[in-house]
Amino acid sequence: MKWKFYSLAFVAGMSILTACSSDDNNDNDGNGGNGNGNEIENGTILKGTITSDVTLAAGNTYKLSGEYIVEEGATLHIEEGVKIIAVYDDIADYILVKQGGKINAVGTPDKPIVMTSEKEEPGAWGGIHICGRAHTNAEGGKGSSEIGGAVYGGNN
């Protein structure tokens, strides 16, 4: 029952705002500037792999193009009021947090974090995939995510 409530709350929160367009085409190689956890500029295109801490600053809008992978040891910080818009193209747009990677998303009721797509229809972006080390019922105790092929599961 809790799962259904949290799923419904997440979907409701995601659908509050609609996507908007930006003419800013800054590219992000994944490490957010110098790779020391600095804030990424407003309007930056998120893509690639991050290997150290990165912060998406409060109130900024970012575009997601393709995969954005958080590797082991890195943390993706998403502050309140951030909007992430998946680019409308033929590439699967998603955020993948691999085992040992972290995501710290802190929205508020007044300033929610919004993740949406330029194409306003269900299934237009791949979502967030968090691959932990919890027990699973997969054969051998581990599985592989459908998007990104990352390993999940274990005995933790």
Model-derived features: positions:
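C-terminal motif of bacterial Sec signal peptides marking the signal peptidase cleavage site
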Residues: 16-19
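Bacterial N-terminal signal peptides that target proteins for export
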Residues: 1-7
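Beta-strand/loop edge motif enriched in small/polar residues
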Residues: 21-156
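Sec-dependent N-terminal signal peptides of Gram-positive bacterial secreted proteins and lipoproteins
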Residues: 11-14
